[in-house]
Regions:
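Long, charged/polar, surface-exposed segments that mediate recognition or autoinhibition
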Residues: 83-162
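Non-cytosolic coordination micro-motifs
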Residues: 130-212
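Short, surface-exposed loop and linker segments with low hydrophobicity and enrichment for Pro/Ser/Thr
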Residues: 20-32, 97-111, 168-198
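Short beta-strand element of the conserved SAM-dependent methyltransferase core
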Residues: 68-75, 81, 115-117, 166-167, ...
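Short helix/turn-capping signatures at newly exposed starts of structured segments
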Residues: 22-113
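Bacterial N-terminal signal peptides
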Residues: 8-16
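Positively charged n-region of N-terminal signal peptides that target proteins for export
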Residues: 1-5
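Intrinsic disorder/low-complexity segments
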Residues: 17-24, 52, 115, 129, ...
Length: 212
Protein backbone atom coordinates (compact mmCIF):
# COMPACT_ATOMS: atom_id res chain seq x y z
CA UNK A 1 0.00 0.00 0.00
CA UNK A 2 1.34 3.40 -0.97
CA UNK A 3 1.77 6.20 1.54
CA UNK A 4 -0.75 8.31 -0.39
CA UNK A 5 -3.38 5.55 -0.30
CA UNK A 6 -2.87 5.08 3.44
CA UNK A 7 -3.25 8.81 4.06
CA UNK A 8 -6.52 8.89 2.09
CA UNK A 9 -7.85 5.90 4.07
CA UNK A 10 -6.79 7.50 7.34
CA UNK A 11 -8.55 10.77 6.55
CA UNK A 12 -11.67 8.84 5.53
CA UNK A 13 -11.64 6.89 8.81
CA UNK A 14 -11.25 10.05 10.88
CA UNK A 15 -14.15 11.70 9.02
CA UNK A 16 -16.33 8.64 9.55
CA UNK A 17 -15.56 8.54 13.25
CA UNK A 18 -16.30 12.25 13.55
CA UNK A 19 -19.63 11.77 11.79
CA UNK A 20 -20.52 8.87 14.11
CA UNK A 21 -19.57 10.91 17.15
CA UNK A 22 -21.68 13.82 15.93
CA UNK A 23 -24.67 11.57 15.28
CA UNK A 24 -24.38 10.12 18.77
CA UNK A 25 -24.53 13.51 20.49
CA UNK A 26 -27.74 13.79 22.53
CA UNK A 27 -30.29 16.39 21.52
CA UNK A 28 -30.52 19.44 23.79
CA UNK A 29 -32.65 18.88 26.85
CA UNK A 30 -35.62 20.92 27.95
CA UNK A 31 -34.09 21.32 31.41
CA UNK A 32 -30.91 22.66 29.83
CA UNK A 33 -32.86 25.13 27.72
CA UNK A 34 -35.03 26.18 30.66
CA UNK A 35 -32.00 26.85 32.84
CA UNK A 36 -31.00 29.94 30.87
CA UNK A 37 -34.29 31.54 32.02
CA UNK A 38 -34.54 33.21 28.61
CA UNK A 39 -36.34 32.93 25.27
CA UNK A 40 -34.32 29.89 24.19
CA UNK A 41 -36.48 27.66 26.36
CA UNK A 42 -39.56 28.49 24.30
CA UNK A 43 -37.60 27.78 21.13
CA UNK A 44 -36.82 24.35 22.59
CA UNK A 45 -40.50 23.72 23.35
CA UNK A 46 -41.25 24.51 19.70
CA UNK A 47 -38.50 22.11 18.58
CA UNK A 48 -40.08 19.35 20.70
CA UNK A 49 -43.65 20.38 19.90
CA UNK A 50 -44.77 17.03 18.46
CA UNK A 51 -43.57 14.96 21.42
CA UNK A 52 -44.88 17.40 24.03
CA UNK A 53 -48.25 17.72 22.29
CA UNK A 54 -48.90 14.06 23.05
CA UNK A 55 -48.90 14.71 26.80
CA UNK A 56 -50.00 18.35 27.16
CA UNK A 57 -51.48 21.29 25.27
CA UNK A 58 -48.72 23.16 23.48
CA UNK A 59 -49.48 26.49 21.85
CA UNK A 60 -47.38 27.89 19.04
CA UNK A 61 -46.44 31.53 19.26
CA UNK A 62 -45.17 34.15 16.84
CA UNK A 63 -41.45 34.10 16.15
CA UNK A 64 -41.00 30.32 16.09
CA UNK A 65 -41.61 29.75 19.80
CA UNK A 66 -44.13 27.63 21.67
CA UNK A 67 -45.30 27.22 25.24
CA UNK A 68 -46.98 24.60 27.41
CA UNK A 69 -50.42 25.86 28.33
CA UNK A 70 -51.89 26.01 31.82
CA UNK A 71 -55.50 26.91 32.56
CA UNK A 72 -54.72 30.20 34.29
CA UNK A 73 -51.33 31.75 35.08
CA UNK A 74 -52.78 34.21 37.56
CA UNK A 75 -54.74 31.61 39.54
CA UNK A 76 -52.92 29.54 42.14
CA UNK A 77 -55.09 26.47 41.54
CA UNK A 78 -54.86 26.69 37.74
CA UNK A 79 -51.19 27.46 37.10
CA UNK A 80 -50.02 23.85 36.85
CA UNK A 81 -50.66 21.10 34.32
CA UNK A 82 -49.84 17.47 34.98
CA UNK A 83 -48.64 15.62 31.90
CA UNK A 84 -50.77 12.68 30.76
CA UNK A 85 -47.56 10.62 30.85
CA UNK A 86 -44.04 11.42 32.11
CA UNK A 87 -41.71 13.06 29.60
CA UNK A 88 -38.22 11.61 29.79
CA UNK A 89 -35.82 14.52 29.36
CA UNK A 90 -32.61 12.52 29.08
CA UNK A 91 -32.59 10.79 32.50
CA UNK A 92 -34.86 13.33 34.24
CA UNK A 93 -38.59 12.41 34.32
CA UNK A 94 -40.79 15.49 33.87
CA UNK A 95 -44.33 15.00 35.19
CA UNK A 96 -45.79 18.48 34.77
CA UNK A 97 -45.30 22.16 34.06
CA UNK A 98 -46.06 25.29 36.09
CA UNK A 99 -46.54 28.84 34.85
CA UNK A 100 -47.35 31.42 37.53
CA UNK A 101 -47.88 35.18 37.41
CA UNK A 102 -48.51 37.13 40.61
CA UNK A 103 -48.99 40.83 41.23
CA UNK A 104 -47.04 41.67 44.39
CA UNK A 105 -48.15 45.27 44.62
CA UNK A 106 -45.45 47.87 45.13
CA UNK A 107 -42.82 45.15 44.66
CA UNK A 108 -43.87 44.64 41.05
CA UNK A 109 -44.72 41.40 39.29
CA UNK A 110 -43.61 37.84 39.98
CA UNK A 111 -43.28 35.36 37.11
CA UNK A 112 -42.35 31.72 37.68
CA UNK A 113 -42.21 28.85 35.17
CA UNK A 114 -40.69 25.40 34.92
CA UNK A 115 -41.14 21.69 35.43
CA UNK A 116 -42.18 19.38 38.21
CA UNK A 117 -39.90 16.35 38.30
CA UNK A 118 -40.26 13.04 40.09
CA UNK A 119 -37.45 12.54 42.59
CA UNK A 120 -35.56 14.11 45.48
CA UNK A 121 -33.95 17.53 45.43
CA UNK A 122 -30.33 16.40 45.84
CA UNK A 123 -30.71 13.56 43.33
CA UNK A 124 -32.37 15.70 40.68
CA UNK A 125 -29.86 18.51 41.18
CA UNK A 126 -27.02 16.03 40.65
CA UNK A 127 -28.62 14.65 37.49
CA UNK A 128 -29.57 18.03 36.04
CA UNK A 129 -26.55 20.19 36.93
CA UNK A 130 -24.30 19.04 34.04
CA UNK A 131 -26.93 20.35 31.62
CA UNK A 132 -27.59 23.67 33.31
CA UNK A 133 -26.48 27.01 31.94
CA UNK A 134 -23.70 28.47 34.08
CA UNK A 135 -23.73 25.31 36.15
CA UNK A 136 -20.67 26.38 38.17
CA UNK A 137 -22.71 29.23 39.64
CA UNK A 138 -25.47 26.97 40.96
CA UNK A 139 -25.14 26.88 44.73
CA UNK A 140 -26.79 24.88 47.51
CA UNK A 141 -28.55 26.97 50.14
CA UNK A 142 -30.91 25.78 52.86
CA UNK A 143 -32.17 22.69 51.06
CA UNK A 144 -32.48 24.25 47.60
CA UNK A 145 -30.17 24.84 44.65
CA UNK A 146 -30.10 28.33 43.18
CA UNK A 147 -28.44 30.57 40.61
CA UNK A 148 -29.32 34.26 40.73
CA UNK A 149 -28.87 37.36 38.59
CA UNK A 150 -29.84 40.98 39.12
CA UNK A 151 -30.99 43.46 36.47
CA UNK A 152 -29.48 46.78 37.39
CA UNK A 153 -28.26 49.80 35.43
CA UNK A 154 -29.65 48.41 32.19
CA UNK A 155 -28.12 44.92 32.12
CA UNK A 156 -28.01 41.54 33.86
CA UNK A 157 -25.32 41.03 36.48
CA UNK A 158 -24.27 37.89 38.32
CA UNK A 159 -25.41 38.19 41.92
CA UNK A 160 -24.66 35.10 43.94
CA UNK A 161 -25.55 36.83 47.20
CA UNK A 162 -29.25 37.39 46.57
CA UNK A 163 -31.34 36.43 49.60
CA UNK A 164 -34.77 34.90 49.08
CA UNK A 165 -36.32 36.86 51.94
CA UNK A 166 -35.35 40.28 50.56
CA UNK A 167 -37.54 42.12 48.06
CA UNK A 168 -35.89 43.57 44.92
CA UNK A 169 -35.03 47.26 45.17
CA UNK A 170 -37.17 49.60 43.05
CA UNK A 171 -36.04 49.61 39.43
CA UNK A 172 -34.31 46.22 39.69
CA UNK A 173 -35.32 42.67 38.75
CA UNK A 174 -34.17 39.37 40.20
CA UNK A 175 -33.83 36.41 37.81
CA UNK A 176 -33.47 33.12 39.64
CA UNK A 177 -33.03 29.48 38.65
CA UNK A 178 -34.28 27.31 41.50
CA UNK A 179 -34.36 23.58 42.24
CA UNK A 180 -36.56 22.96 45.25
CA UNK A 181 -39.00 20.55 46.87
CA UNK A 182 -42.36 20.74 45.09
CA UNK A 183 -44.32 20.87 48.34
CA UNK A 184 -46.96 18.68 49.97
CA UNK A 185 -49.25 18.75 46.95
CA UNK A 186 -46.58 16.91 44.93
CA UNK A 187 -45.15 14.33 47.31
CA UNK A 188 -41.79 12.96 46.20
CA UNK A 189 -41.35 15.61 43.51
CA UNK A 190 -39.11 18.59 42.78
CA UNK A 191 -39.64 21.91 41.01
CA UNK A 192 -36.98 23.06 38.54
CA UNK A 193 -37.85 26.53 37.38
CA UNK A 194 -37.08 30.15 36.74
CA UNK A 195 -38.50 33.31 38.22
CA UNK A 196 -38.49 37.01 37.49
CA UNK A 197 -39.42 39.35 40.30
CA UNK A 198 -39.46 43.12 40.58
CA UNK A 199 -39.74 45.95 38.07
CA UNK A 200 -40.31 43.66 35.08
CA UNK A 201 -40.89 45.65 31.88
CA UNK A 202 -42.62 44.65 28.61
CA UNK A 203 -39.23 44.84 26.88
CA UNK A 204 -37.79 42.35 29.36
CA UNK A 205 -40.72 39.96 28.90
CA UNK A 206 -40.07 40.04 25.16
CA UNK A 207 -36.61 38.51 25.70
CA UNK A 208 -37.24 36.34 28.77
CA UNK A 209 -40.94 35.39 28.39
CA UNK A 210 -42.04 35.75 24.75
CA UNK A 211 -45.05 33.50 25.45
CA UNK A 212 -46.74 36.27 27.47
Amino acid sequence: MSKKTFEVMLVGSVMALAAQAHAAEPAGTLIGALSSCQKGFFDAVEAKHDALSKIATVQRHAGGTAFIEVTGRAKEDASFVRFSAPYQDADVPLIGYFDEVRDIGTLGKYYSWGFVVQGKVDDIAKQATPRLAEAKRVRAAEGVYVRSDLWRNGHWQDDDQLAGNTAPAPGTVERVLLIEDAGPEFSGAVRIGCSLQGSVTPAMLATERPDI
